[in-house]
Amino acid sequence: MFKHETVLLHETVDMLEVKPDGIYVDATLGGAGHSEYLLNKLNEKGHLFAFDQDQTAIDNAKIKLADYSDKVTFIKANFRDMKEALNERGIEAVDGILYDLGVSSPQLDERERGFSYHQDAALDMRMDQEQELTAKTVVNEWSYQDLIRIFFQYGEEKFSKQIAREIERRREVKPIETTGELVDIIKTAIPAPARRKGGHPGKRTFQAIRIAVNDELGAVEDSLEKALTLIKPGGRISVITFHSLEDRITKQLFQEATKGPDLPPGLPVIPDEYKPDFKLATRKPIVPSEEELEQNNRARSAKLRVIEKIIK
């Protein structure tokens, strides 16, 4: 069964200031924890559109949320296509959107999906099982330079060159097929003193390959830009990020949206059309409480940022 500890559950939904008759979007359905809590706040006029590109997540959510079936629409799609999918269903604007950008724990834990460096499986890492590009293709066919780039940019891996060189050496002998083989390559490439500190040596490389396979950062940027155009005045967008790359994209997009155009200083009155359309709901990101961290270690790096469209 799809088990997933929902991070910042109450904070993420409560910060949306849910209207009982509003229209909401869960851009990252996953284990459906946020969706369930949000649906609980809606009356018979309210509705939730829940997106996931993983059919397993949708199938499990249909069971978990069976009591709310008249209030929720499930959409199997990448959240970068959210606006188009909503428009097709006659929805032009919504009251709130939430994102939980953590990979669902079940996906990490399902051996055959190939996300985990703890279990040996085929190199896959696709969120959408119907897409062609897999981790095996990245590892075996991408150039030495491209591997260095993704390991460094997406994994912030100090030993990117050493790992890419070892991959190149091994794949010349035979294709690299499994996560276990990749872990072995990473352990060979990273110097012993560095291997012994800072968690599993494969963590950064696996993250980098997963982001590349699923174009996660491109999807986040596309989706958030569209989300800003979907939100009604007074509506909010909540975004939970788990690593600095996604957080940087979210922070920059939100800062850009809350800035008005450059005006000469000293104007006595600023016309409405020159005022920004958005404001940050909190000055600093919200982070999990000590209590939550004790119960769920995966929440440690979570940050919640919230933006609101100003009513003019």
Swiss-Prot record:
Subcellular compartments: Cytoplasm
Primary gene name: rsmH
Entry binding sites for S-adenosyl-L-methionine: 32-34, 52, 79, 100, 107
Name recorded for this polypeptide: Ribosomal RNA small subunit methyltransferase H
Cellular-component GO terms for this entry: cytoplasm
Organism (species): Listeria monocytogenes serovar 1/2a (strain ATCC BAA-679 / EGD-e)
Keywords on record: Cytoplasm, Methyltransferase, rRNA processing, S-adenosyl-L-methionine, Transferase
Family: Belongs to the methyltransferase superfamily. RsmH family.
Gene3D superfamilies: Putative methyltransferase TM0872, insert domain (1.10.150.170), Vaccinia Virus protein VP39 (3.40.50.150)
UniProt-recorded Gene Ontology molecular function terms: rRNA (cytosine-N4-)-methyltransferase activity
